[in-house]
């Protein structure tokens, strides 16, 4: 449940407070990351442990969960490990080309650096390396691995393409 980690369940309140916070931080030269894009407001479970399936209509998603991300501009955003069946019934947003391209990049007009949430979370159904590669293939610019397991990090270094230029 994201409610305890959010400003509100009301998308207008989230949009207004989010915009104020981002403006304040950026004015003070602090970078911000908006998360979890395209939105987890309608989720009823914690994606650290289980994959949220958000069965809302496209219209409801655009009016509620997706709305704050159109208002709150940042250079960085973190994807949601949730399934939105009305857009892509098979993949979490992190692994979905459809959601990243059509919803995040086009509808929300997000032009910044797109970062996956932690690829070792239980809400992703593949192994660590596969989760990382699928996130990059779907359109994430960076993948996060946050559990501190050095053995896993060593494996990832071998399969993740190196960044040799920024475009």
Show which residues each predicted segment covers.
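A substrate-binding/cap region within the structured catalytic cores of diverse enzymes
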Residues: 1-7, 18, 22
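Second-shell residues forming the walls of enzyme active-site clefts
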Residues: 13-26, 30-167
